[in-house]
Amino acid sequence: MKTYRDHYFLKAKQENYPARSIYKLKEIDNRFKLFRQGMKVLDLGAAPGSWSLGAAERVGPKGRVLACDLQTTDTQFPPNVTFMQEDVFNRSEAFEDALAAMGPFHVVISDMAPRTTGTRFTDQARSLELCIEALAVADHCLIKGGSFVVKIFMGPDVKQLLDALRARFETVKTFKPKSSRVESKETFYVCLGYRGDGQQD
């Protein structure tokens, strides 16, 4: 198991990414073709910045990435990435202005995860709260036909999230990348074809 984990950790360091999570996003994009040149992407829970870097590469210099996280990061981003230190549960006026100025977005991605307590039920409940808030942000700024990717710690209460996703998107897929740790409870919902009517629910 340790060798398996170290493979992605070392690969990330060799390729100048701040975290191994970059390979999860690459697997998701290779499978579902989320990104195209010139797209605008919103990255929630972006620190330390691997997903933002990966998205920036795939949308190219004419694309834009707005990244935010409760924590700051010292990652050096390319010119097409804007990073803001923000709490998605208490969004500042400056962040709302950035959403309005840079949006609407073609893709919203969320790798947000709670600080784990070691108590499975608590961690799953907090993960679900983050997913629901990420979806609320997506409802606010995702274009019709757009895509949404969100990380969830699987548990008994995910049905309410799945129901909300299926009401908003044409296609909802469950995907666990090979680069996820085998013992991890995380998985990703990959949602395609936003209907554009989430705010009316």
From Swiss-Prot:
Its EC number is 2.1.1.166. This is Ribosomal RNA large subunit methyltransferase E. It catalyses: uridine(2552) in 23S rRNA + S-adenosyl-L-methionine = 2'-O-methyluridine(2552) in 23S rRNA + S-adenosyl-L-homocysteine + H(+). It holds the Pfam family FtsJ. Belongs to the class I-like SAM-binding methyltransferase superfamily. RNA methyltransferase RlmE family. GO terms for cellular component: cytoplasm. Keywords: Cytoplasm, Methyltransferase, rRNA processing, S-adenosyl-L-methionine, Transferase. Signal peptide: none annotated. InterPro entries: RNA_methyltr_RlmE, RNA_MeTrfase_FtsJ_dom, rRNA-MeTfrase_E, SAM-dependent_MTases_sf. Coiled coil: none annotated. GO terms for molecular function: rRNA (uridine-2'-O-)-methyltransferase activity. Transmembrane segments: none annotated. It is an enzyme of class 2 (transferase). It comes from the Bacteria. Specifically methylates the uridine in position 2552 of 23S rRNA at the 2'-O position of the ribose in the fully assembled 50S ribosomal subunit. The active site is at K151 (proton acceptor). It is found in: Cytoplasm.
